[in-house]
Design a protein with these regions (language model features):
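Active-site-lining helix/loop region of Rossmann-like oxidoreductase modules
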Residues: 86, 91-238
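Structural motif
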Residues: 37-38, 60-61, 88
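Short, hinge-like loop/turn segments at secondary-structure boundaries
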Residues: 7-12, 75-78, 103-106, 127
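A short hydrophobic/small-residue beta-strand
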Residues: 56-58
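N-terminal glycine-/serine-/threonine-rich beta1-alpha1-beta2 phosphate-ribose binding loop
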Residues: 1-49
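Short, acidic/turn-prone active-site loops that include or flank metal/cofactor-
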Residues: 20-21, 62-66, 91
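Rossmann-fold NAD(P)-binding glycine/threonine-rich loop
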Residues: 41-48, 53, 62-84
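A generic structural signal for alpha->beta connector loops
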Residues: 10-13, 54, 82, 172
């Protein structure tokens, strides 16, 4: 049952945008599951309090789990408090397959292509010679590890952290980020190879109407994850 929710035009938005106020409210005490859709910094700041209050937590800003020490501590807390942490598939496909073959992976890469405006505000541009407004053709912004990518593009590549956690870790997962002014979708291309064979997934998502940094599919994935939790007697997928 949905006890309460807030959107941009919702009168209750002030309650949900101030975590301390929300944490002390009667609404919070009545909840079983908290859904995070704020930022990776919010995940690191508030997750432990949520788990310690014995609430389950569904996380969309998976980049908050790029700190392995923090994630391990949170997992220990969840066991102690009998609380669960859920990471939906998000704006990609194939996450269950990557989990299935994680012990047999040799390489795991993801190439993310978005319109330049999707990268507005990314810390990467503080020290880069590349200016978003000057990008007139497909431009590679970054190539490196998932752990570096999420720090430079915290609002754009949560999916890279998701596949890294499902697969061979953040240091070993390679990420390429491309800005393309001619593209109208958020494109993610995943390639993993190993003794099992190869998995090649391409997803082209419509950007969220209210936040072009992410994909509409990410919201739909969270909703489906929640729906699945409400019907644990029948499950499709790994």
């Amino acid at each position: 049952q949905v006890i309460s929710s807030a959107g941009q035009d919702n009168a209750e938005l002030h309650l949900f945008s101030d975590f301390n106020k929300f944490y002390e409210s009667p609404v919070y005490s009545s909840l079983d599951i908290i859904i995070e859709c704020a930022s990776k910094d919010a995940v690191r700041e508030f997750s432990k309090r949520i788990i310690e209050s014995k609430k389950d937590l569904l996380v969309l800003s998976v980049g908050g789990f790029s700190d392995q020490k923090f994630l391990s501590e949170l997992q220990d807390l969840s066991i102690f408090n009998n609380a669960k942490i859920w990471i939906p598939t998000g704006a990609i496909a194939g996450l269950d397959s990557i989990r299935s073959v994680r012990k047999y992976l040799d390489s795991l890469t993801i190439t993310t292509t978005k319109h330049p405006k999707s990268f507005a505000g990314a810390p990467y541009f503080k020290n880069s010679k590349i200016k978003l407004d000057d990008i007139s053709k497909e431009t590679v912004l970054f190539e490196g590890s998932a752990i570096t990518a999420i720090e430079l593009f915290p609002a754009n590549v949560n999916v890279a952290v998701s596949i890294a956690l499902a697969g061979i870790g953040l240091e070993n997962t390679r990420v390429k980020i491309i800005a393309d002014p001619m593209i109208s979708v958020n494109k993610h291309e995943i390639l993993c190879k190993g003794s099992f064979g190869e998995i090649h997934v391409i997803v082209q998502n419509i950007p969220s109407p209210t936040n072009p940094k992410t994909s509409y599919l990410a919201s739909l994935s969270a909703i489906e994850c929640l729906r699945g939790l409400c019907n644990e007697n029948f499950r499709i997928g790994t």
